[in-house]
Amino acid sequence: MTEQTQDENKLIAERRAKLEHIRANCPANGHPNNFDRKHKAADIQAEYGHHTKEELEGMDVQRSIAGRVMAKRGPFLVIQDVSGRIQAYAGKDVQKDLKATFQGLDIGDIIGVTGKLHLSGKGDLYVNMEQYQLLTKALRPLPEKFHGLSDQETRYRQRYVDLIVNEESREAFIMRSKVVSAIRNFMIKKEFMEVETPMMHSIPGGASARPFETHHNALDMAMYLRIAPELYLKRLVVGGFERVFEVNRNFRNEGLSPRHNPEFTMMEFYMAYADYKDLMDLTEEMLSSIATDLCGSTQLPYGEHTVDFGGPYARLSMLDAIKKYNPENATIQSMTYEEVKDVEFMRNLAKSIGMTIEKFWTCGQLLEEIFGETAEPQLMQPTFITGYPADISPLARRNDENHFITDRFEFFIGGREVANGFSELNDAEDQDNRFKAQVDAKDAGDDEAMFYDADYIRALEHGLPPTAGQGIGIDRLVMLFTNTHTIRDVILFPAMRPQG
C-alpha cells in the first residue's frame, strides 16, 4: 500500500466517522431528500452581479441554492452546481445552531443553502445562510489540487471526479451535447425523419471493420454489434422514407488510438433523388451553420491552426491529393489511373516510400494507404477527397466516366477523416458481385471485408431510388469544436485497458 493510499484511507475513515456523528445527532441530515433548490449559481450571478452592496440590501433578495462544496475559508463556502459557482456565508449564529454538521463539513460535500443575497467587500455575491442542510456527505476526498486532475488515466477512469474538478472537461461535454442537438435540429429542418435501426445484426455490414460478436441464447445464433446502420437505413429508403437519419453508436472490434474508440457515435443519413455532390453541399451548409450558431464564428482554433468552416471547402480526388503532397516524387507526379490499376506497380510504389504492406491489399487499398501515409495528415482545412476506388467502396455507385472509381468522398479536417459519403449503389446485380468480391477478400485474409447480405440484395431488387448517404463521426467533430486532440477527451467513459 502506497503512502498516498494510506493517507486517503485515513481521510475516508475520518469522513465516515463524521457521517456517523451527523446521523447520531441530526438523523434528518443523514441523506435527506427534501431540500427544494429553486435557483442556480449562474442565474444569480447574471441577474444580481452588477448591483452594488447597498442596492442588494435594499432589494432583500432571498435565494435557495444547492451544490458541492469546493472550498471552505472560515465562514465562507464556495458552492458549485451545474451552472457555475457562488459563495455562501455562515454567520456565528448559524454555525452555533448547526454545529454538528457545519464543523464536520468537508470539501466535496453536497449541501443546500437558503438566505439573502449580499455583496462582499471584494465585490463577490454570496448567500447569507439562514437555512442550511447537508444533503450528501462525500466519503472520498477530492484531489488536493482543486483546479484539476493532473493524471490523464485517472481523468478517464474516474470521469465523475474529472467533471467535478475540471471546468474544461465539463465545458467539452456541454459543447458535445450542443453539437449533437444542433445537428439533429438542422436535419429536422431539412425534412429528414429521425429513425432507430437495430444495434444487433445477424449479418454485420455497412462498413469495412471487424465486428464484436455475441450470442443470442433464445434464438441460439451468433449476433454482431453493429458496425454501421447503413444497410438498414437504405432498406427504409426502399420502403419509401425518402430522407432518414440516425444518431447512435457503432461498435468496431479494433485498436485504441487518439482517433479510435471501440464504440463511437455516428450521425448517418440518406436522401433520395440526390448524389454525392449534394451531400458535399449539405455538409458545408451544416457545419458552417453549426459553427456560427454555437461559437459565433466559422473560424475555430485547433492546436496551432485556425480551421475555417465557412466554405467553400476544397475538393480534389485522392490521386490528385497524393500528387499535391508528394511534389518531389517523380513516379507519383506522372502516375495515371492505368498504373494505379497495376497491383505490382502500386506495391512497388508503396515499398519505395517505406510502407509495410499486406499481401492481400488490392490496387484500391494500396492507393488509399499511400494517401493516408502521405496526404491525409496535411489536410488541416475542411477538404473533400473524391475518386475512391470501387474495390474499397463496395456500397458506392461507380463513376460514369471512370468505372475504376466511385462517386464517393471522405471529408477531412484537422488531418483526420470526419465523414464519409457517396452516391449509393442501387444496381442489385452489381451489388451482388461486389459482395461476392468482399467474400473472396475475406477468404484471402482481409478480416475487415464485408459479409454477403442476401436480404439486402432482395431489398435492392424491389428498387432503391437514386440515393446519396453519409456518415459523420460525432466524436471527431466534437474534438474540433472543443480543440481537443484525443477522442477520449470527448467520450464520457472511453474504453480503457485493465489496470495492473
Swiss-Prot record:
Binding site for Mg(2+) 2: 417
Subcellular location: Cytoplasm
Cofactors (names): Mg(2+)
Keywords for the protein's UniProt record, in alphabetical order: Aminoacyl-tRNA synthetase, ATP-binding, Cytoplasm, Ligase, Magnesium, Metal-binding, Nucleotide-binding, Protein biosynthesis
An MF annotation (GO) of this entry: ATP binding
Keyword DNA-binding: no
Annotated EC: 6.1.1.6
Predominant location category: cytoplasm
Protein family membership: Belongs to the class-II aminoacyl-tRNA synthetase family.
Record protein name field: Lysine--tRNA ligase
